[in-house]
């Protein structure tokens, strides 16, 4: 499929920039957002910027994965292998992708109150959300649930990470925390807890009862999504925390 229509040939109300101003970025197609970044078109068939955006998505789709999944981690040279994409266009796209990651991953300031799973996710996204290997991390809180700090405890493979509950308990005491949230990522993006996740959470809840420091939640992060095991399971009813 080719796209010969130029942006100048499109009615002004239907051009990507004008549409973004009129209806907002979230209502634009992915190819339109790419067109705004590209600025101009070209490539085989002298494609318009929108056409080149479609062409990029088609080329990335050949990998049998979601094009946006590939785009998130693509290199400049991989982008430049697509006809019509030179260094200027490639670096503009990659800079926009990285900026999007950073705005999503913004960390709360130290001493911010972590009063919801979403606040904890914000504190951990930089370390966990987009990683290609499983990371297990902890969020340490004071008695008012204010953030003391975060720490990645272990790094595993693409499908698992091994965690010793005793190490979690030691680190919690070392940090002088009054409450704890643990979290890990699923690189697949499927944040449904596995049986191993549930078993580990049960062990941690039992152990935290013994050291009298509450485990507030166990979060699973991945591909922009998250799951709170406190909300999704009955484990906290079975093993109440102080």
From Swiss-Prot:
One MF term in the entry's GO annotations: metal ion binding
GO BP annotations listed: proteolysis
Binding site for Zn(2+): 184, 186, 197
Transmembrane segments: none
Domain of life assignment: Bacteria
Key words of the record: Hydrolase, Metal-binding, Metalloprotease, Protease, Zinc
Family: Belongs to the UPF0758 family.
Name the UniProt record assigns to this protein: UPF0758 protein cce_2495
Organism of derivation: Crocosphaera subtropica (strain ATCC 51142 / BH68) (Cyanothece sp. (strain ATCC 51142))
């Amino acid at each position: 499929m080719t796209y010969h229509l130029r942006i100048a040939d499109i009615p002004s109300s239907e051009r990507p920039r004008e549409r973004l101003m009129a209806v907002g970025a979230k209502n634009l197609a992915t190819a339109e957002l790419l067109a705004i970044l590209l600025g101009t078109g070209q490539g085989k068939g002298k494609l318009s910027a929108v056409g080149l955006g479609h062409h990029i998505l088609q080329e990335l789709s050949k990998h049998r994965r979601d094009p946006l999944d590939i785009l998130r981690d693509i290199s400049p040279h991989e982008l430049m292998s697509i006809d019509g994409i030179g260094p200027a266009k490639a670096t503009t796209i990659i800079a926009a992708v990285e900026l999007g990651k950073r705005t999503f991953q913004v960390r709360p300031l130290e001493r911010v109150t972590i009063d919801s799973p979403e606040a904890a996710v914000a504190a951990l996204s930089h370390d966990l959300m987009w990683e290609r290997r499983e990371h297990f991390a902890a969020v340490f809180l004071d008695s008012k649930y204010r953030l003391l700090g975060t720490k990645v405890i272990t790094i595993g493979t693409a499908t698992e990470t091994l965690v010793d509950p005793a190490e979690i308990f030691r680190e919690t005491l070392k940090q002088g925390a009054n409450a704890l949230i643990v979290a890990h990522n699923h690189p697949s993006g499927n944040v449904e807890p596995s049986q191993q996740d549930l078993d580990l959470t049960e062990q941690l809840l039992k152990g935290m009862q013994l050291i009298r420091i509450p485990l507030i939640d166990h979060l699973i992060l991945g591909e922009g999504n998250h799951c709170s095991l406190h909300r999704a399971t009955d484990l906290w009813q079975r093993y109440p925390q102080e």
